[in-house]
Amino acid sequence: MMSQRYFKLLVVFLGLFAMIASIAEGKGRHKNGGGSRKKTNTVNNGGNNGGKPKVPMCGTTAATCSKGSPSCKGGKPTCGSKGAFNACGGNVKVTC
């Protein structure tokens, strides 16, 4: 009888711990993850990918520039500081 009481207390404690842990992660008990902030699109991120800018690609690797940093503006790959893309190698084109 005494062990059942402790078992019930243990179950309640573990349940509370799980709820607190999920709230601390920002998940809560909601279908959408429970976070109070919605992810929003930022400029030049090519969709809702957590706010990270979309990077031009040479096949499966990130493209590099001779000057400046690579980015995708309006769906087209560009280099900052009037730079040019370094050669991808072969017939591979730079894509966004």
Swiss-Prot record:
GO terms for cellular component: extracellular region; host cell nucleolus. Residues 1-26 form the signal peptide. Disulfide bonds: none annotated. Residues 29-36 are annotated as: Nucleolar localization signal. Residues 41-51 have a biased composition (Low complexity). Keywords: Host nucleus, Secreted, Signal, Virulence. Residues 27-51 are annotated as: Disordered. Induction: Expressed during host infection. The keyword Nucleotide-binding does not apply. It is found in: Secreted; Host nucleus; Host nucleus, Host nucleolus. The keyword Signal applies. Residues 28-40 have a biased composition (Basic residues). Rust effector delivered into infected tissues to modulate host functions and contribute to pathogen virulence. Binds the TGA1a-binding DNA sequence to repress the expression of genes involved in immune responses such as the defense-related transcription factors WRKY18, WRKY27, WRKY33, MYB51, the defense-related proteins NHL3, RPP8, YLS9, AZI1, CRK11 and the jasmonate pathway and regulation genes JAZ1, ASA1, ASB1. The nucleolar localization signal (residues 29 to 38) is required for host nucleolar accumulation but not for the nuclear localization, nor for the augmented plant susceptibility to pathogens. This is Candidate secreted effector protein MPL124478. It comes from Melampsora larici-populina (strain 98AG31 / pathotype 3-4-7).
